[in-house]
Amino acid sequence: MNTRIQKIVDAVKKNGHDGIVISKGSDIKYLTGFTGEYGVAVLLLTEKKNYFVTDGRFEFQAAQETEGFEVVVHGEGLNYFSQTGKLAAEAGVKQCAICGADLTFDDYQDLVSQAPDTKFVSEGSYVEPLRAIKTPEEIETIEQACRISERSFYALLDVIKPGVTEIDIANELEYQFRSRGGSGFCFETIVASGPDNGANCHATASDRKIQL
């Protein structure tokens, strides 16, 4: 069991629970290293065993990228949450922590439908406090990301000139970023010019040409 998982399990046990369900995509990536899209997995952590619930599309990837988990493909007629509830019942989990902010009402209903004898307790996130304290490796990754972003921006400056479209600039920035080792973007690249787009804080790059 990796250190991050063990810290979560220990904290959950300290609060009187014998299991925890984790469904937030970024938390799952942090704890397991899984790089698949968000919303395609749910974790069930217990003292004895940990489960990674997904669907058939991601079974192979989950098995490759995660360690210390039993990868479970949800059964016919079940979804990620109902399958997780079923596993909790089969594992004999009596009191299970969940982060209510990460579940919809339907998710919760699916979860409890398969585990009538398990008490699911909504609490705050157990993972976010852990993520807030950065390891030396994480700090180095952040510093590297800053270097990539800075160098990509300075390389872009030669491209920004009258007649070039916002889309051209966005494409060049993304090229510069990836060519330096960048692996992805938090959101669609924002390139906004002129009195209209320039005032829109979430503008998307358009075919508008840069003007003086």
Which residue stretches match the model-derived regions?
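Structural motif
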Residues: 23-25, 54-56, 75, 98-103
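Short helix/loop capping segments that flank catalytic or ligand/cofactor-binding pockets
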Residues: 31, 61-62, 106, 199-202
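Flexible, acidic/His-enriched mid-domain "rim/lid" segments that flank
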Residues: 3, 79-185, 196
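A generic local secondary-structure boundary/capping motif
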Residues: 9, 31-32, 86-87, 131, ...
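Terminal domain-start leader segments
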Residues: 1-51, 82-92, 110-113, 119, ...
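Acidic/histidine-enriched ion/cofactor-binding microenvironments in catalytic or ligand-binding pockets
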Residues: 44-46, 185, 198-212
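Basic, ligand-binding patches in group-transfer machinery
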Residues: 191
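Compact, glycine/acidic-enriched structural inserts
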Residues: 53-86
